[in-house]
Amino acid sequence: VIGRLDEVVVDCADPARLATFWQAVVGGEIVRQSGEWVAVVGPAQITIGFQRVPEAKAVKNRVHLDIAVDDLELAAAAAEALGAQRVGAPVPDPVGGFQVMLDPEGNEFCFIVGPTLVEDDSTAE
């Protein structure tokens, strides 16, 4: 092991706005707030940092967050009320499904339903 994951960082134009959005989506509390940097520590003790950068988002994310929910439609509607947008229709799969979303700055994320790796320890070694 070389190191440990400390946090996931999102480059953005408005750290406070995105932190408030993501706190409403995943829960937790806002910590380490400055004009250039805001972080949210979620209930699972995963930290999402939001860092101000001068350039706008230009291409599709290479990494995205999957957020486990009980109901895709309810979650998508609640996120839309906070400024998110849906990307297409929900996508079914054999064990559940997912809805691709954009946060208020256009970063992709997914709401997922069905078994998750956190709940399913059969993949643990």
What do these predicted regions represent?
Residues R52-K57:
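Short, flexible, solvent-exposed loop/turn segments with mixed acidic/basic and small polar residues
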Residues G35, P43-Q45, A58-R62:
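Short connector loops at helix/strand junctions that flank enzyme active sites
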Residues D14-E29, A75-A81:
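Amphipathic alpha-helical segments
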Residues L5-E7, K60-H64:
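Short, solvent-exposed beta-strand edge segments and adjacent coil->beta transition regions
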Residues V9-D11, D66-A68:
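Short hydrophobic/aromatic beta-strand micro-patches
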Residues Q33-E36, E73:
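A short, compositionally biased
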